[in-house]
């Protein structure tokens, strides 16, 4: 009788956990829907659930959700100058790596591999799960056979965000000195080299970049501009989230076609279907209540797998710097701040608060001003 009672209790608890998980997923799907998406792919959710062991909280000490006052946040997020003492906390970094491995393995999840798909296979979009795409021949040709980061380990990694706080930072030389440099969304580097550096080992490319930065390739001039940018990568990893939303399908195919037609020397990677929700699951477990992780946070989470020390540059989601000077949203364009909108899928100030906490504990180095030696 006692055994039967325990069995019923276990079954009830299991149902409760499943209900709470799907309630959370429904909430994020509704939020994403407000910004143009529809939801998450079931297979990705199921895969995440199979690995989501609870991790030890090391980011937010409070058990309650972090609340961010957006009135004048840059004042509250002052970080010591680059020249001040910062020491890497190797113990904490290793603990975070082990925690993240309970949710995902960056070596595997960084890209779908050729052996797992074939031309014509049907894939449900992560944010438009009622919509599907067929794996094209071009996409299949560009899928890697093995992970581009298989057995890779680096002493120091730089992750370069795109905030205007990089302007006049003089961080280019310091960034280029790192073992592995990650950049976001094909951001231009040549004309900003003094502040952002030139070295690129991995660069992300959201499909929306083709619309925003290359005018949807409306003519030969814009196609040539994109082609030049791709050629400049010269063997780097080009990380394209191809399976997120239906709206990116044509743009991904355009880029794939250009790469193949012009024999561009890049190593393409297309993140796994479960990656985004696995990353979000890790941060939620650590009480960082993000809606959808930004590219920068995704890259940091992945980098913990293969980087001993991680240095962040250009992560600053506020319109004023620490001295109350105006800061451009991106260092290279005139895009406006949009994270305060209810429709925005991102919670950048909340992410920054978590990263700042990790900086203060020595798990990562966050540079938001001038670099050492900058003049």
UniProtKB/Swiss-Prot annotation:
Gene3D superfamilies: Glycosyl transferase family 29. Disulfide bonds join 157-307, 171-371. The active site is at residue 346. Residues 1-6 are cytoplasmic. Glycans are attached at residues 60, 72, 89, 134, 219, 234. Belongs to the glycosyltransferase 29 family. This is Alpha-2,8-sialyltransferase 8B.
């Amino acid at each position: 009788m006692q055994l039967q009672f325990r069995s019923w209790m276990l079954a009830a608890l299991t149902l409760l956990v499943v209900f709470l998980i799907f309630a959370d997923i429904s909430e994020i799907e509704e939020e994403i829907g407000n910004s143009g998406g529809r939801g998450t792919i079931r297979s990705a959710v199921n895969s995440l659930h199979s690995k989501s062991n609870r991790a030890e909280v090391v980011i937010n000490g409070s058990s309650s959700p972090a609340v961010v006052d957006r009135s004048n946040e840059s004042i509250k997020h002052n970080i010591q100058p680059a020249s001040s003492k910062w020491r890497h906390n190797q113990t904490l970094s290793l603990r975070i790596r082990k925690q993240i491995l309970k949710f995902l393995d960056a070596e595997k999840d960084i890209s779908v591999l050729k052996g797992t798909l074939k031309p014509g296979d049907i894939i449900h979009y992560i944010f438009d799960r009622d919509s599907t795409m067929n794996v094209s021949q071009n996409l299949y040709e560009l899928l890697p056979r093995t992970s581009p980061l298989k057995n890779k380990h680096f002493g120091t990694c730089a992750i370069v965000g795109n905030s205007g706080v990089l302007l006049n930072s003089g961080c280019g030389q310091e960034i280029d000195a790192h073992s592995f440099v990650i950049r976001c969304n094909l951001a231009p580097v040549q004309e900003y080299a003094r502040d952002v550096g030139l070295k690129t080992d991995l660069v992300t490319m959201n499909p929306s970049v083709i619309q925003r930065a290359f005018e949807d390739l409306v003519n030969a001039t814009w196609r040539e501009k994109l082609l030049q940018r791709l050629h400049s990568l010269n063997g780097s990893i080009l990380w394209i989230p191809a399976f997120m939303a239906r709206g990116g399908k044509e743009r991904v195919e355009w880029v794939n076609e250009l790469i193949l037609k012009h024999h561009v020397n890049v190593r393409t990677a297309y993140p796994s279907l479960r990656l985004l929700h696995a990353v979000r699951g890790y941060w939620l477990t650590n009480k960082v209540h993000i809606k959808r992780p930004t590219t920068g946070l995704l890259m940091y989470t992945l980098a913990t797998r293969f980087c001993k020390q991680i240095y962040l540059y250009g992560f600053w989601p506020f319109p004023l710097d620490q001295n109350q000077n105006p800061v451009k949203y991106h260092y290279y364009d005139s895009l406006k701040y949009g994270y305060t909108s209810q429709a925005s899928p991102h919670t950048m100030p909340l992410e920054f608060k978590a990263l700042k906490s990790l900086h203060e504990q020595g798990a990562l180095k966050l540079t938001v001003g001038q670099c050492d030696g900058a003049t």
